[in-house]
Structure formats: structure tokens, C-alpha cells
């Protein structure tokens, strides 16, 4: 087991897909820490539109400008992943008051599982506060334009998913 390091933060999520809101959070977190690990969760129970490998690749591309940010996929308990990364901080985004109850429960559970790790909440810039991966997926599934919410590579990946489902 690694010792928790407050200079290393883990930002976990399914990132299905990564959005401009996620990117904004990483852009603001990167200067605060020596190392930020974006942990892309496998989460098969959520029925992701994109494979874990594709989500990791899209996040790596979107965050490539940051030398201190790394993207890793994981399929373990978050507490185990955080310990494996040696992180002392768990980053979570809060878009709206509606996110708070769930995030508070998760932070409390994580405090029991990994008491040496602090949860830090960041809010996105106002222009990203309404963006969610699930809304982006739904808009894309129905043929809407998601280019204002995600990087161009994600727009293309979602277009490919829609096209392959239409052919199935």
C-alpha cells in the first residue's frame, strides 16, 4: 500500500464521454497538484456507449496539454485505485445543488474506506454547469449537435457509435 500524498489527486469518473465540463475541472485542478490522475472507471453496470479503451484514449487526447495529468482506466473499487495511485486527494465535480447529496454520500463512504484521503469538490465554470455525459450521449443518440459540449474527437466517436447502432 502506498502512502497518501496530498500532492497527488485522483479525479474518477466513467467519462462516457469526457465533456468540456470535465476538461474545465482538470484545467483548474492541474495547477493545484503535482500530479492529477484521471481515473476512467470500467463501470459495465452503467452500460457505457464507449469502451473503456476508447474513453481512456479520448480523455488522454483531450488532456494532453497537461504534463502532470495522466489518464488511467480501472476496474477495481475506487478506494483501491486511489491507494494504488498513492493519492491523498479525491477530486469530485459539483455542477449543481442536485449533485451534492449523492457526492456527500460518496465522500462519507470514501472517508470510511480511505480515511487518509480527503475529498475536494470543485465546481465547473458557469458555462459548463449544465453539461453531463448522460445528456451528451442522449443528444448524440438522437442525432443532435453536441459540438458545443465535447471536444471534436468525442463528437466523431459518438457519431461512429450512432452509425454502428443504426447499421445493427
UniProtKB/Swiss-Prot annotation:
GO terms of biological process kind: coenzyme A biosynthetic process
Chain sites annotated for binding ATP: 14-15, 22, 93-95, 103, 128-134
Site, Transition state stabilizer: residue positions: 22
Positions with a binding annotation for substrate: 14, 46, 78, 92
Cellular localization per UniProt: Cytoplasm
GO cellular component, one term: cytoplasm
Record organism: Xanthomonas axonopodis pv. citri (strain 306)
Record gene name: coaD
Chief localization: cytoplasm
Protein name, entry field: Phosphopantetheine adenylyltransferase
Gene Ontology MF: a single term: ATP binding
Enzyme class label: transferase
Its EC number(s): 2.7.7.3
Pfam families (UniProt xref): CTP_transf_like (PF01467)
Annotated keywords: ATP-binding, Coenzyme A biosynthesis, Cytoplasm, Magnesium, Nucleotide-binding, Nucleotidyltransferase, Transferase
Cofactor: Mg(2+)
Catalytic activity, reaction form: (R)-4'-phosphopantetheine + ATP + H(+) = 3'-dephospho-CoA + diphosphate
Involved pathway(s): Cofactor biosynthesis; coenzyme A biosynthesis; CoA from (R)-pantothenate: step 4/5
Subunit structure: Homohexamer.
Amino acid at each position: 500500500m502506498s502512502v497518501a500524498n496530498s500532492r497527488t489527486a485522483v479525479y474518477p469518473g466513467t467519462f462516457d464521454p469526457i465533456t468540456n465540463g470535465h476538461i474545465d475541472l482538470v484545467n483548474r485542478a492541474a495547477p493545484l497538484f503535482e500530479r492529477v490522475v484521471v481515473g476512467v472507471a470500467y463501470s459495465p453496470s452503467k452500460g457505457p456507449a464507449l469502451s473503456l479503451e476508447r474513453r481512456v484514449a479520448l480523455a488522454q487526447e483531450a488532456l494532453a496539454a497537461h504534463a502532470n495529468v495522466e489518464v488511467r482506466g480501472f476496474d477495481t473499487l475506487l478506494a483501491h485505485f486511489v491507494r494504488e495511485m498513492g493519492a491523498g486527494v479525491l477530486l469530485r465535480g459539483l455542477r449543481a445543488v442536485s449533485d451534492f447529496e449523492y457526492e456527500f454520500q460518496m465522500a462519507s463512504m470514501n472517508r470510511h474506506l480511505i480515511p487518509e484521503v480527503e475529498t475536494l469538490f470543485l465546481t465547473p465554470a458557469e458555462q459548463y454547469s449544465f453539461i453531463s455525459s448522460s445528456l451528451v450521449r442522449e443528444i448524440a443518440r438522437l442525432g443532435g449537435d453536441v459540438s458545443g459540449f465535447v471536444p471534436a474527437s468525442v463528437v466523431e466517436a459518438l457519431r461512429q457509435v450512432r452509425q454502428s447502432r443504426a447499421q445493427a
